[in-house]
């Protein structure tokens, strides 16, 4: 049995130039693995604690405390442990070494979710190498998933909300090549639509409008949300993929929810007169009008993270034709997932490992979601690294969907390219989720 001999953390930088945590693990049989954690821009208030240093260095965003917690507390406690025992190691870190809890479970406020997760990811990678199997297969084994499926990529090609400097309230407009026969073909479709979209935007809004945002998407000076959908529809048509490439949205509505329980579609305009503030019901009806007019299959965070009422209404009214994805609502937290299942608040989980802070808890949230008949979309964060763990995670858990940005910017392509490698490695056994992206496998 190989055991952990070294756990070493350092501060590196994410794709936005902000510090983040990277961890190396060495084992007794000479293996060395490295894992790095991402960070988000629009973060849900219920996410586990991302520990930052504060102060003036790096504008308060340094992670030397989290790095110190790995090097001085977590690391020494893991020496001699077997890296294949993921659940035991995660539970030891979360319950014993950290031990902080709030009403939603283990909140990692002592050591930081970024410290614990970096180690959890590295342990998972080490466990795979020690077991002599690919990472995706190791993850499938940890979850008890017998059938591996490649996900449909959801490319975020138009950016608004907190990710962009335009007037657009809604944060992401995505394309999903569900009509492809393989992941490789899905990449081809996505890339071609992306380039057609670039031409359409350049022609309509000028060269500057094709500058890319944090996730590689375009942020043209669009005034309203329907304009974004219209651009996607045009680009899909020009690429010749009408019916094969469909649309998803991430509204990130918590970003424009007001104290008075209204949603301000003009929230980015300073000193605005409130003329575009609408009720939750009016916003729901706006989504329904979009769904009637465009090939929309997925809407993420359509309401505020505490607006359980409108989530449930929306899921009841359109949940069969559209997946209603909980991100800020659920924050990959098993307790919040359980509440949403009980209240029928949504019907899909957005899986972000750094919202909850360990591989084991992420697997638990996915298994609960699948048992409830939900879809699962694996996701990056807007501040990413070159780490490709989530590509293997999406395959190993057969989530059926992954969003990790546009087919642009190396930290995004790193994940898509890893999925191409995995598909090639699986050969004739490779299955692409395609139109079954919401339920690619039976619950495991």
UniProtKB/Swiss-Prot annotation:
**Predominant location:** cytoplasm
Reaction catalysis annotation? (2R)-2-phosphoglycerate = phosphoenolpyruvate + H2O
State its cofactor: Mg(2+)
Binding residues for substrate, per the UniProt record?
Answer: 163, 172, 300, 327, 379-382, 403
The catalytic residues are 215, 352
Q: Where is it located? A: Cytoplasm, Cytosol; Nucleus; Mitochondrion outer membrane
Record text on subunit structure and interactions: Homodimer.
In its UniProt entry, what is this protein called?
Answer: Bifunctional enolase 2/transcriptional activator
């Amino acid at each position: 049995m190989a055991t952990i001999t070294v756990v070493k953390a350092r501060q590196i930088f994410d794709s936005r130039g902000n510090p983040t945590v990277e961890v190396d693990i060495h084992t007794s049989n000479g293996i060395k693995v490295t894992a790095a954690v991402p960070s988000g821009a629009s973060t849900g208030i219920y996410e586990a604690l991302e520990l930052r240093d504060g102060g003036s260095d790096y504008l308060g965003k340094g992670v030397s405390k989290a790095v110190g917690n790995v090097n001085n507390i977590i690391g020494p406690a893991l020496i001699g442990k077997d890296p294949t025992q993921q659940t035991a190691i995660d539970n030891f870190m979360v319950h014993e070494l950290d031990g902080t809890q709030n009403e939603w479970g283990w909140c990692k406020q002592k050591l930081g979710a970024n410290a614990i997760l970096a180690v959890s990811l590295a342990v998972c990678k080490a466990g795979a190498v020690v077991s002599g199997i690919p990472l995706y297969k190791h993850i499938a084994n940890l979850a008890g998933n017998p059938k591996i499926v490649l996900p449909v990529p959801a490319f975020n090609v138009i950016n608004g909300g907190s990710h962009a400097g335009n007037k657009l309230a809604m944060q992401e407009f995505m394309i999903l090549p569900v009509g492809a026969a393989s992941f490789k073909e899905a990449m081809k479709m996505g890339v071609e639509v992306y380039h057609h979209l670039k031409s359409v935007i350049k022609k309509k809004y000028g060269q500057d409008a094709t500058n890319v945002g944090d996730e590689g998407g375009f942020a043209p000076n669009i005034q309203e949300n329907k304009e974004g959908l219209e651009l996607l529809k045009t680009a899909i048509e020009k690429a010749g993929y009408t019916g094969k490439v469909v649309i998803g949205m991430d509204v990130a509505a918590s970003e424009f929810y007001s104290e008075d329980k209204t949603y301000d579609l003009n929230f980015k305009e300073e000193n605005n007169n409130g003329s575009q503030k609408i009720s939750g019901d009016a916003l729901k009806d706006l989504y329904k009008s979009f769904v009637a007019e465009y090939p929309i299959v997925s809407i993420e965070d359509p309401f505020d993270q505490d607006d359980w009422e409108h989530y449930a209404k929306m899921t009841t009214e359109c949940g069969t034709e559209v997946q209603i994805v909980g991100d800020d609502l659920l924050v990959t937290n098993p307790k919040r997932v359980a509440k949403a299942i009980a209240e029928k608040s949504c019907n899909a989980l957005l899986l972000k490992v750094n919202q909850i802070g360990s591989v084991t808890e992420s697997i638990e949230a996915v298994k609960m979601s699948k048992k409830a008949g939900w879809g699962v979309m694996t996701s990056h964060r807007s501040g990413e690294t070159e780490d490709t763990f989530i590509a293997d995670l999406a395959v190993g858990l057969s989530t059926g969907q992954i969003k990790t940005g546009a087919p642009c910017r190396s930290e995004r392509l790193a994940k898509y390219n890893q999925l191409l490698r995995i598909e090639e490695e699986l050969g004739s056994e490779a299955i692409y989720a395609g139109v079954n992206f919401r339920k690619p496998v039976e619950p495991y």
